[in-house]
Each structure stands twice: as C-alpha cells, then as structure tokens.
Design a protein with these regions (language model features):
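Short glycine-/acidic-enriched loop or helix-start segments at secondary-structure transitions
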Residues: 15-16, 46, 108-110, 132
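N-terminal phosphate-binding or glycine-rich loops at protein starts, especially the Walker A/P-loop
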Residues: 1-45
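Hydrophobic/aromatic ligand-binding patch that stacks against planar heteroaromatic rings
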Residues: 25, 59, 88, 111-112
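Short, acidic/small-residue loops that bind anionic groups at enzyme active sites
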Residues: 31-35, 113-137, 144
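Short coil/turn connectors at secondary-structure junctions
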Residues: 1-3, 29-33, 62-65, 92-96, ...
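Short Gly/Thr/Asp-enriched flexible loops that form oxyanion-binding sites at enzyme active sites
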Residues: 17-22, 103-118
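Gly/Ser/Thr-rich loops at beta-strand to alpha-helix junctions
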Residues: 9-13, 100-107
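Glycine-rich oxoanion-binding loops at beta->alpha junctions
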Residues: 44-99, 104-105, 123, 127, ...
Length: 146
C-alpha cells in the first residue's frame, strides 16, 4: 500500500515519534510506502510532500515538533477541496491516509471518508485531551506538566 501521512492542528510533543512508528511498522512489517504531506491538508491540496522511509526516520525520536509541519485548515475551506484531495490520491497512487491530529483534523478525515470514500486511520493528538473515546491523548501530559 501507499499511504499519505499528515499532522494537523497545533504542535505538540511526540509527533515525530508517531510518524516514525507508523513508517517503521508499515515499511518493515507490511512493505508499505509512505508520503508525508507538508503542512497538513494544505500540503495535500498543493501536492507538497516528501517520501517517508525508514532511512528518513532515523534520528527522529529526540527531535521535537513534526518534520512534515502542521497547520489548521481543511479541504472543505475550498469549494473543490474534496475533489482535489481525491485527485491527488489518484495521481500519487495513495490507498489511504494516516491523519495525526485533534478534533478538527480527525473530523475532516471522517468527512472525507464519508464524502469521497477516502480510507483513513486517525491518531488522536491534542494538548487539550478532549477527544471522545480516549483516556489520555499524547501531547497532554507534557502540556500540563511543563
């Protein structure tokens, strides 16, 4: 499979570690390929991405932030946004997305799945710890302890 990865919403600790884990597990165990979209959904709409490999993930654990950038926003901010997402998936041969984000990013991912059938896996991330169905989201403990 070829999978798009993006981090949406605000920055928080642990994003690079999650990206690294997704890429390593998928690449090593399932021979998947990964594309990291720069600055969340904006990167998808503008087709700005980098290839993510086990090699590019080396040294990521101690680095803060996210190597692919993050931003708030939605393809639904544009009349043709959902269709542009579908077109990018088709052009790049993407089978689905891993979306790492909070309520906004995960809601967008769910709506894209509903409207255009985009397969998505959501990774809950928020310093607010307000995502239904989770006990503690990564990013929260560091936010309240610092």
């Amino acid at each position: 499979m070829r999978i798009g990865v993006l981090t949406g919403g605000g920055d928080c600790p642990g994003l690079n570690a999650v990206i690294r884990a997704v890429v390593r597990k998928g690449s090593v165990d399932f021979d998947d390929e990964f594309v990291g979209f720069l600055d969340a959904w904006d990167g998808v709409l503008e087709k700005k991405f980098i290839e993510l490999t086990v090699g590019t993930m080396r040294g990521m654990l101690p680095r803060g932030g996210t190597i692919i950038g993050t931003r708030r926003g939605s393809p639904f901010d544009h009349a043709d946004g959902p269709q542009r997402v579908r077109n990018v998936c088709d052009e790049l041969g993407l089978d689905g997305f891993v979306v790492i984000g909070g309520n906004g990013s995960l809601s967008v991912a769910a709506e894209l799945h509903a409207q255009i059938g985009l397969p998505v896996v959501g990774v809950p991330k928020t310093i607010d710890n307000d995502i239904v169905g989770t006990d503690v989201c990564f990013g929260f403990n560091t936010a309240v302890q610092i």
